[in-house]
UniProtKB/Swiss-Prot annotation:
Protein name (Swiss-Prot/TrEMBL): Proteasome subunit beta type-3
Pfam families: Proteasome
SUPFAM superfamilies listed in its UniProt record: N-terminal nucleophile aminohydrolases (Ntn hydrolases) (SSF56235)
GO cellular component annotations of the record: cytoplasm; nucleus; proteasome core complex, beta-subunit complex
Organism, scientific name: Picea mariana (Black spruce)
Keyword annotations of the record: Cytoplasm, Nucleus, Proteasome
Protein encoded by which gene: PBC1
Length: 204
């Protein structure tokens, strides 16, 4: 078993009309044994920028602390929030710095940039960026998430429709992956509000 699959995870981010959604499952396991059913994989960097971390749970928490620390330093120096593109470069550099003994995480970054234009990207464990204009996925449920998102996604969705689409894609995908599950966390972020919801899925 790959170390990336040790704790199990499912992460997806999707772009709508001047908004984005990011969702994850809630299971923390050790291989096939479930340890917790309310594990947080999506973290807020600031009001318009979120990062999701799939992979090894210990590295998820370590990396989030490092990202939060770097962003705080940036805020103190620049007196403004970081743009999503800048944050993606920061994450990429942090991961590449440790390329010979990498963090076992695949980040998904989603944010609203200038003129509230949505930005999403993912990268591998050594920081190679993959940009997208529709959706990005990561985690042990990535293959089924790709299929679900490709069949359900359509451009320029409003926040409520985007929530429905990403939720259905997530729930149908984690049903096909025994290492992720136990419902989901969904954040839908538009310029003037953040909707946070918890999904109840199959509890097995």
């Amino acid at each position: 078993m790959s170390i990336f699959e040790y704790n199990g995870s499912a992460l997806v981010a999707m772009v709508g009309k001047n908004c984005f959604a990011i969702a994850s499952d809630r299971r923390l396991g050790v291989q096939l044994q479930t340890i917790a059913t309310d594990f947080q994989r999506i973290f807020k960097i600031h009001d318009k920028l979120y990062v999701g971390l799939s992979g090894l749970a210990t590295d998820v928490q370590t990396l989030y602390q490092r990202f939060a620390f770097r962003h705080k330093l940036y805020q103190l120096r620049e007196e403004r929030n970081m743009r999503p593109e800048t944050f993606a470069s920061l994450v990429s550099a942090l991961l590449y710095e440790k390329r010979f003994g990498p963090y076992f995480c695949q980040p998904v970054i989603a944010g609203l940039g200038e003129d509230d234009k949505p930005f999403i990207c993912t990268m591998d464990s050594i920081g190679a960026k993959e940009l997208a204009k529709d959706f990005v996925v990561a985690g042990t449920a990535a293959e089924s998430l790709y299929g679900a998102c490709e069949s359900m996604y359509k451009p320029d969705m409003e926040p409520e429709e985007l929530f429905e689409t990403i939720s259905q894609a997530l729930l149908s995908s984690i049903d096909r992956d025994c290492l992720s599950g136990w419902g989901g966390h969904v954040y839908v972020v538009s310029p003037n509000q953040v909707i946070e919801r918890t999904l109840k899925g199959r509890m097995d």
